[in-house]
Regions:
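Active-site nucleotide-donor binding segment shared across nucleotidyl transfer reactions
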Residues: 31-64, 68-74, 226, 253-254
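Conserved catalytic core of two-metal-ion nucleotidyltransferases
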Residues: 2-7, 11-35, 80-140, 160-164, ...
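Helical (often loop-to-helix) elements that flank the catalytic cores of nucleotide-handling enzymes
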Residues: 77
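A short secondary-structure junction signal
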Residues: 141-148
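Short amphipathic alpha-helical patches
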Residues: 57, 72, 156, 274-279
Length: 279
């Protein structure tokens, strides 16, 4: 992890266009690796809405997400790690198993020439990134137990990152401190490992539903398995990236009428960070 004691010597990335260009370069590298190794991925979430509705970024969005079936996800982590270790030192994929400072149950691909400081406790300073989410098999009979368990683990992970804040009511701060004391025996990595184990419970089963279990929108993530079987390329800004062919089923399940713009007060970014060039 990059030390930030030289931050005053770094050039800050203040332009949203510059930030987006870096993110697209990361995605283009991932796309190239996926083409090389015949790995199927799809842009997802707001990135997919952007491609369909705007032919690029949602105007107020500031990140890029992709998703892969668990088997493809594992392959991507493996081949990108090998590419990095074999000399491509610009782009690095990280999971909690690859870096002890990384505390999420999904992967990110970072640009090693950048530094990104997120103003959230527990988020270490890596670089500008693209989020990479695994999609897992889901069985109807297990969903009633899986989602509540995953929610508990997610809340545990979130609670361990909260700190005392002056603007927060005293009783809430005290409740957070008490909760964090109760959670002391459970490390972040233990929680993430439990989330992964729970998500991969049906990996060896053929199911008719899939979902991003480790993060996201809970039951709204559940979609028919068949929509992950065919992929196409969609225009995004001045490039093309892979997407599931049945993106309409996926997007309407998650977001309803995804072609309708949200109210003006909802058209805001949800991330708080600063980005820099290291050199």
């Amino acid at each position: 992890m990059w030390k930030i004691n030289r931050i005053n010597e770094m050039k800050q990335i203040t332009s949203s266009n510059e930030l987006r260009q870096i993110q697209m370069d990361i995605l283009s590298y991932v796309d190239g690796v996926c083409r090389k190794y015949d790995i199927k991925y799809s842009i997802s979430g707001g990135t997919l809405i952007g491609a369909v509705r705007h032919k690029g970024f949602i105007p107020w969005d500031d990140d890029i997400d992709i998703m892969l079936a668990r088997s493809e996800y594992d392959r991507l982590v493996e081949v990108m790690t090998n590419e990095y270790n074999n000399g491509n030192r610009r782009y690095r994929i990280i999971t909690h198993n690859l870096d002890n400072d990384y505390l999420f149950p999904y992967a990110k691909v970072f640009d090693e020439k950048t530094l990104l400081i997120e103003h959230v406790r527990g988020c270490k300073n890596f670089g500008v990134f693209v989020d990479v989410f695994p999609i897992d098999n889901v069985e109807d009979q297990s969903m009633a137990k899986t989602f509540p368990k995953m929610r508990v683990l997610y809340n545990m992970l979130t609670m361990k990152r909260l700190i005392w804040e002056k603007q927060r009511p005293l009783y809430k701060n005290l409740a957070i401190i008490l909760s964090r004391l109760i959670l002391l025996p459970f490390s972040n990595h233990w929680i993430i490992s439990r989330m992964e184990q729970l998500a991969k419970k049906c990996s060896d089963s053929k199911t008719d539903k899939m979902a991003c279990l480790v993060w996201g929108y809970g039951r709204r993530e559940v979609v028919p398995t068949y929509i992950h079987s065919e992929h196409i390329y969609l225009p995004f800004e001045n490039r093309e990236y892979m997407a599931i062919k049945e993106y309409g089923v996926y997007l309407s399940t998650l977001f309803g009428d995804y072609m309708k713009l949200p109210p003006k007060d909802k058209q805001v970014t949800h991330h708080d960070f600063e980005a820099y060039w290291k050199d």
